[in-house]
UniProtKB/Swiss-Prot annotation:
InterPro entries: CDPF1 (IPR042426), CDPF1_dom (IPR018785). Coiled coil: none annotated. PANTHER family: CYSTEINE-RICH DPF MOTIF DOMAIN-CONTAINING PROTEIN 1, CYSTEINE-RICH PDF MOTIF DOMAIN-CONTAINING PROTEIN 1. Belongs to the CDPF1 family. It comes from Drosophila melanogaster. This is Cysteine-rich DPF motif domain-containing protein 1. Pfam families: C6_DPF.
Length: 154
């Protein structure tokens, strides 16, 4: 028996097609799509309507080594810093842009005129509603923050 006898195929064209890469894998990879430094997550503050593209949403940004937030945050790499070499696991500079309100889930930036943090992040309207449930120190802090933010708007 010839060793090549067991390689004879019933339908050679069908077998070749079965072994081909799927169409989506045949496309050339766009370097722009592969670049992890390109921001792809949209961030829109419901308070001040700031719009920005960010790199990460979650608690543990992969580019900010050792940083773990207590709640999900929209985080972007610092656009004014050069990227670190790929072979070094070096922490990068980053900017925490905002989060979602823990009550109404609206997206808010970290600006004092848009959000307040006390055990969790709140948009100012929800913060005003929750104010009565907080200790006096937190109440004084949010009242001061609201008066300062109202002073800036006028």
């Amino acid at each position: 028996m010839d060793p090549d006898d067991d390689l004879v195929l019933e339908n050679e064209a069908e077998e070749i097609e079965r072994l081909q890469l799927p169409e989506e894998l045949k496309k050339p990879i766009d370097p722009e799509e592969e670049d992890e430094r390109v921001a792809r997550i949209e961030f829109n503050c419901s308070g001040c309507e700031m719009h920005e593209m960010v790199h990460y949403f979650g608690r543990k940004p992969p580019f900010a080594l050792g940083v773990i937030y207590p709640e999900d945050n929209y985080v972007m790499r610092d656009p004014f810093q050069p990227p670190p070499p790929r072979w070094q696991s070096k922490p990068e500079y980053y900017i925490a842009m905002g989060t979602k309100c823990s009550i109404c889930s609206k997206t808010v930036c970290k600006d004092p005129g848009c959000s307040f943090y006390y055990t969790a992040s709140f948009c100012l309207p929800c913060g005003k509603e929750e104010l009565k449930n907080w200790p006096p120190e937190a109440q004084a802090r949010i009242r001061k923050q609201m008066s300062v933010s109202q002073g800036r708007q006028t």
